[in-house]
Amino acid sequence: MSIVVNLDLLLVQRKMKLSDLAERVGITIANLSILKQNKARAIRFSTLEALCRELDCQPGDLLEYAGDEDTN
């Protein structure tokens, strides 16, 4: 996947647990885990907005374009 979700890094920097973030944002821990493991295929803007609000970050802090591995 060429988009990486830096949720782990932001949680560590903010000394926040995944369960605390889930409660604040109103998303299940299971869905946040999918994001954290880079297995999500999409994210709603409302979810991205809520994550950025609670983590006090910009979308670019949370999402990173890593490029394709198979580029020639």
Task: Please tell me what each predicted stretch does.
Residues 39-50:
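Short, basic-rich loop-to-helix N-cap that marks the start of a DNA-contacting helix
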Residues 6, 31-34, 47, 61:
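Residue-level recognition of specific faces of alpha-helices
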Residues 12, 23, 53:
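Alpha-helical residues within the helix-turn-helix
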Residues 8, 19, 49:
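Residues within the helices of the helix-turn-helix
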Residues 16-34:
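Short alpha-helical DNA-recognition segment
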Residues 1-16:
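A short, Lys/Arg-rich alpha-helix, primarily the initiator
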Residues 9, 34, 63-72:
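Short, charged recognition helix plus adjacent turn
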